[in-house]
A protein has these predicted regions:
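Conserved catalytic cores of very large enzyme subunits
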Residues: 90-94, 100-461
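Charged, amphipathic alpha-helical regulatory modules used
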Residues: 1-107
């Protein structure tokens, strides 16, 4: 005897009486007379109809119901079939309503009493009223994604833990990298009704603007916000004002403390990442440096001494930590290691590897013996790097616009569960191919939704 797979994935014994009961209810809804033998015959025809769809002794409840509709229609009971379809849709609406219904009391209590594992899911979210607000809105938004946006197969795969759709609590994209050069040239502004700043003329102003920019953009994205060539673009400001090392360090210190201040939803600090070149990249070396939105009479390549000052100041601040000696969580630095990297016993090298050994803070991009250059890659966050050479092959698109690049979302496939459920290696890869298609479809859907919301003005900055 075969079995039936329910909508929640559970397996139950097949019971033909349930088919007979459903058909009887469809007749009763129309107040249509029938003989019990007619119902039994129709139920038997249903089993014969769905028999070719049985796989490994299992038939899905959806296939059974599809067969009921077709058998009723072909047997001359089109009106009963229509009644059955309406009944089926009504039951589906009830199931969806129950699935999306949120108990406001449980929602608040689970956070306040720390009864829900999600309260401590993100180590950057402090237990606070801001975290409570984020938890409440996140639960609503997650249900909106699963019930109103994603198709049933995607939502079911997430709910059954076949895949995990990250950041369902946010109606936004995942992470983004921004052009620090564009910020230096244009500064903050361009949003109707909001304050617009002039391009920074001094390092202290630029550091404050970067803090504000990262805080603002973090509220429009779920994940990390990144700047590339941090030291290269800051160095001309040191040179233009002939700043001392102490003055430079004070400015960089204000930036580090600023990005570690809770300014994003959920009482969190902006998740920020910066890439430091260490050595001026070839694509910027001969370009005129920009300060105050204007080109200077020297190039970025002329600012090697100032780059070293910026790097030294940043590393020393990260090593020293805050007033209690606690290491800074942000920004997460990524250093480019190229053939030009100076491996000698310089002070900056010593400090760099001291910071690495003390906190394990920085990431290193190894370009030695690589066909890529630092300008080809943008580090978005701790787990994502984008190859700009691939993006350049794309024609337009919101996420393929030069240095301002990003990621639409993240989906994790539950590989251990997949392996456990697979009968053999071939079955494993068959299941994996299917889940990869489901995951890709979810990301495509999310991209369409976020792009539409962007065009509608939901992300003003």
């Amino acid at each position: 005897m075969y079995e039936v797979q329910k909508r929640d994935g559970k397996i139950a014994e097949f019971d033909i009486a349930k088919i007979s009961s459903a058909i009887s209810k469809a007749f009763d809804a129309l107040e249509k007379q029938y003989h019990p033998s007619t119902i039994d015959l129709l139920a038997l025809n249903v089993t014969a109809h769905f028999e070719p769809r049985i796989k490994n002794g299992i038939i899905s409840v959806e296939d059974v119901q599809d067969s009921v509709e077709e058998v009723l229609s072909t047997a001359g009971y089109a009106d009963v079939a229509k009644s059955y379809i309406l009944y089926r849709k009504q039951r589906e609406k009830v199931r969806n309503a129950n699935a999306t219904l949120l108990d406001y009391k449980d929602l608040v209590d689970q956070y306040v009493k720390v009864e829900d594992w999600r309260v401590k899911e993100n180590s950057t979210v402090t237990y606070s009223v801001g975290g409570l607000i984020l938890s409440n809105s996140g639960a609503i938004t997650a249900n909106y994604w699963l019930s109103e946006i994603y198709d049933d197969e995607v939502a079911k795969a997430h709910r059954n833990a076949d895949i995990h759709l990250h950041d369902l609590s946010m109606l936004t994209g995942y992470c983004a990298g921004w052009s620090l050069k564009q910020l230096i040239q244009e500064c903050l502004g361009g949003v109707p009704g909001k304050i617009t700043s002039k391009p920074a003329s001094h390092l202290s102003s630029l550091c404050n603007q970067m803090v504000n920019f990262l805080g603002i953009m973090q509220n429009e994205w779920a994940g990390a916000q990144a700047f590339s060539s941090f030291d290269t673009y800051l160095a001309p400001f040191v040179k233009a004002d002939n700043l001392t090392y102490e003055e430079t360090k004070q400015c960089v210190e204000s930036f580090v403390f600023g990005v570690n201040t809770p300014s994003r939803w959920g009482t969190q600090a902006p998740f920020s990442n910066i890439t430091l070149d260490w050595v001026c990249p070839a694509d910027l070396r001969d370009q005129p440096a920009i300060v105050g939105g204007k080109e200077m009479d020297f190039t970025y390549g002329d600012c090697k001494v100032e780059m070293d000052m910026v790097n030294k100041a940043f590393i020393e601040i990260m090593i020293e930590g805050d007033a209690n000696g606690r290491g800074f969580q942000y920004p997460i630095p990524t250093y480019s290691i190229t053939r030009d990297f100076d491996w000698s016993e310089t002070e900056n090298n010593r400090l760099l590897f001291e910071m690495t050994s003390k906190y394990g803070t920085p990431y290193f991009s190894n370009y030695i013996n690589s066909d890529m250059e630092p300008s080809d890659v943008r580090s978005m966050c701790c787990r994502l790097r984008l190859d700009l050479r691939e993006l350049r092959k794309k024609s337009g698109g919101f996420f393929g616009s030069g240095e301002s690049t990003g990621s639409i979302g993240v989906v994790t496939i539950n590989m251990p569960r997949l392996a456990y459920l697979s009968a053999d290696e071939a079955d494993f890869y068959r299941r994996l191919d299917h889940l990869m298609d489901v995951s890709a479809r979810s990301l495509h859907t999310k991209r369409e939704v976020v792009t539409r919301l962007l065009d509608a003005g939901l992300y003003p900055y």
